[in-house]
Amino acid sequence: MKEHTHAFGLTVGTLFTLVMFVAVGADRVGDVYPLDTCPISGKKLGSMGDPVVKVIDGREVRFCCSGCVGKFEQNTEASFKSVDAKIVETQKPSYPLDVCINSGEKLGKDAVDTVIGNRLYRTCCADCAKEIRANPGKFQEKLDKAVIEKERATYALKKCPVSGESLEGGVKPTEVVVAGHLFRLCCADCKAEIEKNPAKYLDLLKSPQTH
């Protein structure tokens, strides 16, 4: 097929390549943004309308308004350092493993806390953290399985938090992990709804007696 040159001297093939590059570059790696506040203003997400969702360096970040996006991107290293500290603070108490997810060694006082793809990983050393960075999908799957195994026994919601359908009476729920916690759903499609507003559904886990 012949390539046709358009304005600015770009061929159809070149344009297609650029579009594909942008699409791939905008893909989220890892989990949704797990915090309920804007990383710049500190305001509760949703307090100024629908949050602005951006993928920056492969990670999803949510902001209270578009004005905060530029401030975050002025120094992404410092901005992510602040976000990571909050993720460690919120996810560490419920972290499901007492061994390094890579080596299997017992985690001690010198364990390394690393946030990759908006998830906390605890390793015995910095070298193991590098292994996770090299293959995040593999280790997220392992971490998700550990979360499910730990939280399944104490999971208190009797209904799908999205549809409201009962999960009792022999129903086999779909089990997913979002923001480091187990959700039991009536179907896989409901996961997308939780990812739209993870803070809302995490609150349901904190007060299961009302749901």
Regions found by a protein language model. Give the residues of each.
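Intrinsically disordered, low-complexity terminal tails/loops enriched in metal-binding residues
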Residues: 4, 21-211
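Bacterial N-terminal signal peptides
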Residues: 9-22
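N-terminal secretory signal peptides that target proteins for export/translocation
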Residues: 1-8
